[in-house]
């Protein structure tokens, strides 16, 4: 019996195949597949799912036929299930959103909250009765506070203000120009509006903000602390929807933004100010969470093992 878990995100698609004991037999990576609508979206989605699953099957040495599969997607599952059924040979199928599989990966099948800060951001939780709630995750136009994209957007804003003479001096200005080859912050702002700088490429500049903060730039430090504060706020919002005051709650963090010690420790401090809350890193990745959901679909209470250590 074979089981499939897929994490289809804004940056990459990761597939894991496991046997009935929970042992991971193969993994595969392909391009992003978060949007089906729009020019070429359907074709990219199909290519990403097929590519990641075929790569995982090749590594495992198995045919692509599954007892159960769970796939979680950024951008929601509503327009994707029919396509998945066309692509996969599977008996039992769950198509859900990426926050749901991230939560299962982060805290297992227990109650808790996962707060994700990668290209975008969201907080998502589940109580002991299975009730779920979310906060944030509104996308880059209306939300994604504390995400990598948002941090870079804020960094460009302070760089523009400094350049135009209505903001304080900041090393973020020179950092952004050095990293992108732009001559001015104004030029970079216009480049960010072009197809040369998709959101993922803009978000990829976020670690440079952390490096600038490490060199003592006050505005860079403030941006990171503010981002951590916003992530703590959406976490508190989910807690308030699901848990009573003082009730023990496990909060897990996930995503590249938490690679910053400043963000991570400020977030932990703010979350643990709430009575009963403990914060720490996610136990497993969203792809492992998807695999765990696939096991549950088939009525198996097994834990994944032999999980690849290097996963996007």
Predicted regions and their residues:
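Conserved phosphate-binding catalytic cores of ATP/NTP-utilizing and phosphoryl-transfer enzymes
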Residues: 90-115, 131
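Glycine-rich phosphate-binding loop of actin/hexokinase-like ATP-binding domains
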Residues: 110-162, 166
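ATP-binding/phosphotransfer module of carbohydrate and carboxylate kinases, centering on a glycine-rich
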Residues: 1-62, 105-113, 156-312
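Short, basic and Ser/Thr-rich N-terminal targeting/leader segments
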Residues: 9-11, 65-67, 117-119
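Short gly/pro/ser/thr-enriched loop/turn and capping motifs at secondary-structure boundaries
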Residues: 101-103, 122-123, 287
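Short glycine-rich anion-binding loops that position phosphate/pyrophosphate groups of nucleotides
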Residues: 11, 74-77, 119-122
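Glycine/charged-rich beta-loop-alpha catalytic/anionic-binding loops adjacent to active sites
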Residues: 86-94, 131-139, 269-278
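Short beta-strand-loop/turn "lid" adjacent to the catalytic site in phosphate-handling enzymes
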Residues: 34-37, 53-95, 106-107
